[in-house]
Amino acid sequence: MYEITITFTEVDHKGNDRTRKENLILEHAESFADAEQIGYDYGSGYTGIDVVSIKRSKLKEIVNEKPFNDETCKIYVAQIVDHFVDLETEETKDIKYSVALFAHDMNEAHKAIEQYIKQGLEDMDLVSIKESKYNGVLK
């Protein structure tokens, strides 16, 4: 997964040009060049499109799908710690990772991530959950 930031110019309701910035998650980009091309394709209907930032995402996965055409859904990022026992040393070790999910509010996000944690094979705990600045996910 990659994360990109694009800027473009759009016309507001008064007819003025306005520069807008969007942060997007790319789920299936193969390379930086592929991520850049997806960003330009996404913004092809706008003028002044520019991909200003590309980076590999720290997100492990996206745990649910956005409801079809539901623009009120926000993207939340949850940090999870996975506790496991190292079979060689028999010590408990922790791995922290982040996942993204769609929800309308914090309560719904918390319920969704709790269900995700219950599906885990190992002992997992929620560290934090917060509303992200991502505008969308491109597949």
Question: What kind of region is each of these model predictions?
Answer:
Residues 17-34, 38, 99-108:
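Short, flexible N-terminal segments of the mature chain
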Residues 28-58:
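Short, well-structured hydrophobic secondary-structure segments
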Residues 1-9, 76-83:
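A short beta-strand micro-motif
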Residues 10-26, 46, 91-99, 119-121, ...:
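A cross-kingdom feature marking solvent-exposed beta-strand/loop segments within repeated
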Residues 46, 57-121:
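Short, solvent-exposed interaction modules
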Residues 1-4, 12-13, 50, 64:
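Short N-terminal segments
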